[in-house]
């Protein structure tokens, strides 16, 4: 069989402090990240293996200082690879940043929802970012970039998952 995807953990650093995240145990070490050369070597191996999707994740991959360089490298050196980012989306409230990611080659995005409202979001993450995430979804919708919304289901939010889906829908996310 063919290896279809590869996940690259770019950084352990994150701008949130989600109570359910595996990075919590690791200490959210922002300095614990791959070098640009290490990422390029991994991408080259993926290209040699005809990998179709490279998932860039973390921590929070949007905080990785060489992210745009990685996307450009994939676009220029391995155009058959579809780069995908799994993110909390908070930094995508900046429409200019969204556009730079797309211009550099981002082709797919997964935004991890953290709650059905601002209170639940802050309780889960330690950060008041609910409105920023909804703006980010609206920004992404306006770009035509393909994306999904996902959500870690916990005992605390299981009864409100449908409300979180509705909030994403009201921000412009479609369900196809």
Predicted stretch roles:
Residues 1-87, 92-107:
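Conserved alpha-helical substructure of the radical SAM core
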Residues 15, 91, 116, 154-156:
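Short, solvent-exposed loop/turn segments at secondary-structure junctions
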Residues 30-34, 125-132:
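Alpha-helix N-cap and loop-to-helix initiation/capping positions
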Residues 34, 65, 128, 156-159:
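Residue-level signal for the nucleotide or nucleotide-sugar donor/cofactor binding architecture
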Residues 98-117, 173-176:
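Non-cysteine beta-strand/loop elements that form the S-adenosyl-L-methionine
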């Amino acid at each position: 069989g063919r290896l279809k995807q590869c996940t690259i953990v770019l950084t352990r650093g994150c701008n949130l402090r989600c109570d359910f995240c595996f990075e919590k145990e690791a200490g959210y070490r922002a300095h614990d990240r791959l070098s640009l050369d290490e990422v390029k070597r991994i991408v080259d191996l993926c290209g040699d293996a005809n990998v179709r999707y490279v998932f860039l994740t973390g921590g929070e991959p949007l905080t990785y200082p060489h992210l745009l360089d990685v996307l450009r490298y994939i676009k220029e050196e391995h155009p058959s690879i579809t780069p995908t980012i799994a993110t909390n989306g908070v930094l995508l409230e900046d429409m200019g940043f969204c556009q730079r990611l797309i211009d550099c080659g981002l082709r797919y995005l997964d935004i991890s929802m953290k709650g059905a409202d601002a209170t639940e979001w802050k309780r889960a993450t330690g950060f008041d970012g609910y409105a920023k995430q909804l703006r980010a979804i609206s920004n992404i919708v306006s770009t035509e970039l393909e994306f999904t919304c996902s959500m870690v289901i916990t005992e605390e939010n299981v009864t409100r998952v449908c409300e979180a889906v509705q909030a994403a829908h009201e921000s412009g996310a479609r369900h196809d």
